[in-house]
Amino acid sequence: MILSDRDIAWYIEKGLLRIDPLLDDTIRENGVDLRLDSEFCRFNPDAPELDTRKPFNREIYYNCVKVDPEQGFTVKPYEHVLATTMETVCLPDDLVGLVNVRSTFARYGIFVPPTVIDAGFCGQITIEIIGSAYPVRLYPGQRFLHVVFVRTTSPVANPYHGKYQGQRGVTPPRPD
């Protein structure tokens, strides 16, 4: 079942769902909007082959910057970048979050691959952004993502306790 604005407010009021900071315009009709933070990471086109079984070195594969909210960050045509949300989101054991880009940004040609926030997860959300056919400037603080919460039929037996639990900022891959 997809939660309505009233359901989301109830979960937050009871302390079961945490979104921090929670602004007045965060809760929408059937989900929440999350804002872009100021950190963006570009993939380094000159990086060597990435071996997914070896430790990942962020400095080799990404060029990360903190951007001024007034200057923004330009996503180049068809470029893939990583970003993160300003908000920390903590889900209880009976909610799953389905993340998508807000339709305004989709209409600009921006794409975000489907992302799931697992039941029991707590942290900022790292997302991949794929650029449009033309450069698009994004700004920290913009409501960029929409998260729809789905209630599971029963609380999950094994809430998320994985390698990304508690992540802050843009979090690179952590090989198994």
From Swiss-Prot:
Self-association and partners: Homotrimer.
Pfam annotation, one family: DCD
Pathways per UniProt: Pyrimidine metabolism; dUMP biosynthesis; dUMP from dCTP (dUTP route): step 1/2
Positions of the catalytic residues: E128
Intrachain S-S bonds: none
Enzymatic reactions: dCTP + H2O + H(+) = dUTP + NH4(+)
UniProt xrefs under InterPro entries: dCTP_deaminase, dUTPase-like_sf, dUTPase_trimeric
UniProt keyword Nucleus present: no
GO biological process, one term: dUMP biosynthetic process
Role, per record: Catalyzes the deamination of dCTP to dUTP.
Protein name: dCTP deaminase
Binding positions for dCTP per the UniProt entry: R102, S103, T104, F105, A106, R107, D118, Y160, Q167
Gene that this sequence comes from: dcd
Keyword annotations of the record: Hydrolase, Nucleotide metabolism, Nucleotide-binding
Protein family (similarity comment): Belongs to the dCTP deaminase family.
EC number: 3.5.4.13
Species of origin: Hyperthermus butylicus (strain DSM 5456 / JCM 9403 / PLM1-5)
Hydrolase recorded as keyword: yes
SUPFAM superfamilies in the cross-refs: dUTPase-like
Top-level enzyme category: hydrolase
Molecular function per GO: dCTP deaminase activity; nucleotide binding
